[in-house]
């Protein structure tokens, strides 16, 4: 069960992080010079990322998950080890808020290896 005060704090932090990182989003550039040369700068989104969230740190999930969501990453895998046999409700709330469907309840090298070799994520944070 998630304490309503914690939920409110997460919602507040989420909005602030979202606003800041939206400002960082790079735009594609299309340019035609006077000689009719077309120059293009195109951003290509990473197709999948793995987020390693150690222990009870929903802030880590926010700080790495929100930018991935803004960038348009299609598949996000979150690894968060159980603490005293339980999933952290605050981290799970962040995962739900970000629409993360792939959640691993493991930690350490096993989590990193699973995200790299089983889920085949392109980048791990």
Task: Please provide the spans of the model-predicted regions.
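A broadly conserved amphipathic alpha-helix scaffold signal in soluble, globular proteins
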Residues: 15-18, 65-66, 96, 113-117
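Conserved small-residue-rich beta-alpha loop and adjacent elements
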Residues: 31-93
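Charged, amphipathic alpha-helical interaction segments
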Residues: 18, 22, 69-73, 100
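Conserved NAD(P)+-binding/catalytic subdomain of aldehyde/semialdehyde dehydrogenases
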Residues: 99-125
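A glycine-rich, acidic short-motif signal
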Residues: 92, 97-100
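Generic marker of "main functional regions" within proteins
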Residues: 20, 27-31, 59, 72, ...
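Generic structural signal for well-ordered, non-membrane alpha-helical segments
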Residues: 2-17, 42, 61, 84, ...
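N-terminal Rossmann-like NAD(P)+-binding subdomain of aldehyde/semialdehyde dehydrogenases
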Residues: 1-47
């Amino acid at each position: 069960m998630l304490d309503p005060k914690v939920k409110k704090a997460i919602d507040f932090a989420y909005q602030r992080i979202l606003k800041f990182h939206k400002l960082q989003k790079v735009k594609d550039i299309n340019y035609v010079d006077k000689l009719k040369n077309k120059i293009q700068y195109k951003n290509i989104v990473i197709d999948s990322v793995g987020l390693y969230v150690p222990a009870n740190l929903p802030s880590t999930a926010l700080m790495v998950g929100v930018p991935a969501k803004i960038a348009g990453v299609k598949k996000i895998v979150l690894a968060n080890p159980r603490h005293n046999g339980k999933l952290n409700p605050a981290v799970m709330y962040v995962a739900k808020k970000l629409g993360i469907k792939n959640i691993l309840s493991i930690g350490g090298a096993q989590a990193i290896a699973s995200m790299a070799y089983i889920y085949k994520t392109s980048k791990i944070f």
